[in-house]
Design a protein with these regions (language model features):
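Short, surface-exposed "cap/lid" segments of acyl-processing enzymes
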Residues: 54-111
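Catalytic nucleophile-loop/oxyanion-hole region of alpha/beta-hydrolase
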Residues: 113-128
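N-terminal cap/lid segment of alpha/beta-hydrolase-fold proteins
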Residues: 26-70
Length: 128
């Protein structure tokens, strides 16, 4: 039994280290990002290119003190793989509320949409 366990561990380690890797550009060039003063409109414009977003999973900001009002702390919620902003709600909302912080829900490429949309994205696009 011990030899079987060791064999499985070695096989898994070999797969992990020798398996195929998806080449990806992981550096982000922030100089190309031009966010307008109306953040809600900026996010809505970016999401308008998709007609299959599940309701309430789009990129959005939950403003603590009114639309457009900055706070000293802001939280960014990045959901898990194949999930959406609704993954662990209302936990992020309660943390933001306790801190008096604005809360930004992002939506990774392909997430919060149809099953087919998940196949459209790659690692590099998830970094954008």
């Amino acid at each position: 039994m011990r030899m079987l366990f060791i064999g499985v561990v070695i096989a898994l380690a070999a797969i992990w280290f020798l398996g195929p890797r998806e080449p990806a550009q992981l550096a982000i060039d922030f100089t190309q990002i031009n966010i307008t003063s109306d953040i809600d409109a900026y996010l809505a414009e970016g999401e308008s290119g998709f007609d299959d977003i599940t309701p309430n999973t789009e990129k959005r900001v939950i403003w603590a003190n009114g639309v457009g009002e900055k706070t000293s702390v802001a939280l960014v919620y990045i959901h898990g793989f194949s999930a959406s902003s609704e993954e662990i709600r209302p936990v992020p909302d309660k943390v933001a509320q306790a801190l008096g912080a604005n809360l930004y829900f992002t939506r990774l490429r392909g997430h919060g949409r149809s099953n087919e949309a998940m196949a459209e994205a790659d690692v590099g696009q998830w970094m954008q």
